[in-house]
């Protein structure tokens, strides 16, 4: 700290006293300051602190009129040696000046010594005055940080007004006494003097709040505890230091003067807002030191450039040795030094240039995708950045696009390649001019002119070689009419042999003819149509039909060309229209017709719409802009289908008749109409069965056949079998006679039944009267177990029959009605349940028979008793044989 003091007994002291005398006589006086101090002051003891800025702002010269005191810049007053205040007061003046003598101030300071009082003890018998306790007024006090002592050092004295009447004992408590830090303060209980036992670090403890107590000998406290605030005055014992040990800034090269580079910051642990923490920054050294490029603001620490001549290519890094000092940068302030690094960012301020001004190379003709040359460039900018990466351009000589130049990403070289064949017969040498730039845009340095593009010349020599045919041009266009019939010839594709400049010896072949329209003459290359040319074919795009032709020489070398057949439109398609029309009555009563014409625009619209006379009573047809027409109802029609014939013509009168199927529907939109369109209504179901459906049908049919066969077997086995004859038919119906001749002729049946059809043994038969003539249906009476069959075939007149056959016929005529009746009645009993059980009596039944009665009841009881067929008697066998023979 800057402390100005007078040393007695020296020449300087005399001059200083003279100067003080002048200041005292001519300076203005400020407000007087009074300080209460102990009567005994030791050397280097802080007496107090005054506010100098209230008297004079930023004084550059501070002097004391009393050599026993020195004053710091912050207003702190220190003693220079031990002092004993003999009188109660001692005064001196602080003289302030701005350094140039233009303004001077004087500040009066008065020191008052504290008086010692005589205490007496309070007697217990003395009455206690009835008064309320008072709170002591706190006494301000401060401690100097890092005080050198001697210790214990007197700090303050507390006294109670009750000491005038009683003997008071004093005590203190709080931080520094009975709390951390312990035993830093103590008090003399009799006098109230407070002492400090050791030095204090303000950065650790900036103040102490201690409570003082005043009590009598018997423990009575006449006053409230007194709060004592001991503030530790800062001592400039901490040097500032930079916040970061390693600081790196970057700034673009060629930047303008005054460009901010960065800001350095430092920290001082001393008391903020004081001179101890007022920091100043300074650049001590720049490495390299010439020329000077940087400066720093002393208060903010902001580093800026002082020149626009920063060039990364000359020096890419600078180091600055910095100093930060407290006490406002005064020489006696504490300081610290540090080093920061400033890196220059690259800018594209250097153009690339070729290492050679010209190059020569060669290449064979007709070679493609081959590298022919590499060119090297230099660039002083930072490698592998857009500022140094080269971009090559062919400026001249590549009008046909035969060459391409690229950049090798690894070496930054320019690579020249041939991408399109060169022809030795056309040109034997090509000269190229190539330029180079950087990927990044060029940045001009200060006061510098923009550079020009660096260029070089490349001479490419073309080497001759025996080559195949050339297809030039690659695409040839010929014209043809739409609808050209088959068998017509067209000019084809012609290739040339560059060695002979003719097409002799070449053979042609088509490799691309999508719709097979043409055939090619292998010698001349001309085309012949094999189909009718149709411009509306799906293979025709934009009126063009493409054909690929290959020309091959005798050595097998070939070239490929494309022949484009440009078809001229022909009016061969009438206008077409959608024949299904829907009119939604809820929305509108008309439909918009929009025909299309597959021909070109010259053979298309405007269209002319004509309505057939048969539909004019119900409909009107109005043309709209030649492309559309409106079909409108003359009046609201019923919801139904209507056929409307119309005719549409294109601009050349080519027309076609159409029958529209108009669906008048109750709907808002056609999709809501539930009436099926005509095509859907008339369409036959088109059902295609898959393999699984067919397999399912086959398996289902097989299963159904199995079920039917099973039912047939069960029914055949269990159903009721109607017997054709009872078991005793032979004995009951044959008359015993000794003659073989015919019996007595019977002309009428004993029982007459109406002619009817009865089911006997599941065979239809006609039952008539006995002796009736006519044709009889063949009948078969089959005995299952006997193996014999009784048959009746178609016969003629009974009179013409043989005698034996006549007897059999009479027997059959007699028994058949009766058997039919019985079968009929049994059937009625089975179905309607109205037949009664009865027994038919006969006059003669002959020998007993195993078959029993022929009544319906016995027949029902023995439906399946066919065992008698196994033991037929001889008479029945004879009759059966007779019946079988015919």
Curated annotation (Swiss-Prot):
TM regions (residue ranges): 692-714
Primary localization: membrane
Molecular-function GO terms, alphabetical: calcium ion binding
Tree of life domain: Eukaryota
Subcellular location: Cell membrane; Cell junction, Desmosome
GO biological process per UniProt: desmosome maintenance; establishment of skin barrier; hair follicle morphogenesis; homophilic cell adhesion via plasma membrane adhesion molecules; negative regulation of epithelial cell proliferation
Thylakoid is among the record's keywords: no
SMART domains, sorted: CA, Cadherin_pro
Distribution of this protein across tissues and organs: Expressed in the epidermis and inner root sheaths of hair follicles (at protein level).
Position of the signal peptide: 1-29
Pfam family, one: CADH_Y-type_LIR
Keywords associated with the record: Calcium, Cell adhesion, Cell junction, Cell membrane, Cleavage on pair of basic residues, Glycoprotein, Membrane, Phosphoprotein, Repeat, Signal, Transmembrane, Transmembrane helix
Effect of a null allele: Knockout mice are fertile and born at the expected Mendelian rate. As a result of eyelid fusion failure 10% of pups are born with one or both eyes open leading to corneal damage, inflammation and corneal opacity or micropthalmia later in life. Skin is flaking and scaly at 2 days of age. Mice grow slower than wild type litter mates and are 30% smaller at weaning (21 days of age), however at 3 months of age they have caught up and are indistinguishable by weight and size. Thicker epidermis at all body sites with additional layers, principally in the spinous layer at 2 days of age.
Keyword Flavoprotein among record annotations: no
Protein topology in the membrane: Single-pass type I membrane protein
Extracellular side: 135-691
Residues bearing carbohydrate: 130, 165, 546, 613
Primary role: A component of desmosome cell-cell junctions which are required for positive regulation of cellular adhesion. Required for desmosome adhesion strength between the granular layers of the epidermis, as a result moderates epidermal proliferation and differentiation. Is therefore required to maintain postnatal epidermal barrier function and normal hair follicle morphology into adulthood.
Record remark on domains: Calcium may be bound by the cadherin-like repeats.
Protein name: Desmocollin-1
Organism: Mus musculus
This protein's encoding gene: Dsc1
